[in-house]
Amino acid sequence: MLTRALNDLKNPKSKTGSLQIIATFTGTTGSMGFITGRRYELIVRYIRSRGRFEVKTRDGQLFCPYQSTEAFAKNWSASAIQKGA
């Protein structure tokens, strides 16, 4: 589910500009300020000019870039995904 949504976002033909995701961080605590096991409301965008995903918390407090769908999926477990504009 998560990988498919990220790949759709990355697709140049996609009209989706962002994803809103509720996810639990499964990576290492302290990585860019995120805490293992905590749920976050995220906004994810794919920046084509940089070739990466940019993830920020909905409140804008935390940010983390990811180079691939695999890297993102390795650190997050999504419970809800909604396409944004």
What are these regions (language model features)?
Residues M1-T28:
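Mixed-charge, Lys/Arg-rich low-complexity intrinsically disordered regions
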Residues R4-N7, G17-L19, Y40-E41, G60, ...:
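Intrinsic-disorder/low-complexity peptide segments enriched for small residues
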Residues A5-L9, T57, A73:
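Intrinsically disordered, low-complexity peptide-like regions
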Residues N11, V44-R45, A78-A80:
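Short amphipathic beta-strand and strand-loop transition segments with alternating hydrophobic
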Residues P12, T16, T29, F34, ...:
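Intrinsically disordered, low-complexity segments
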Residues K15, L19, R50, T69, ...:
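Compositionally biased regions
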Residues T24-S68:
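Basic/aromatic-rich interaction segments and small domains that mediate binding to polyanionic partners
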Residues Q61-A85:
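Intrinsically disordered, low-complexity, charged/polar segments
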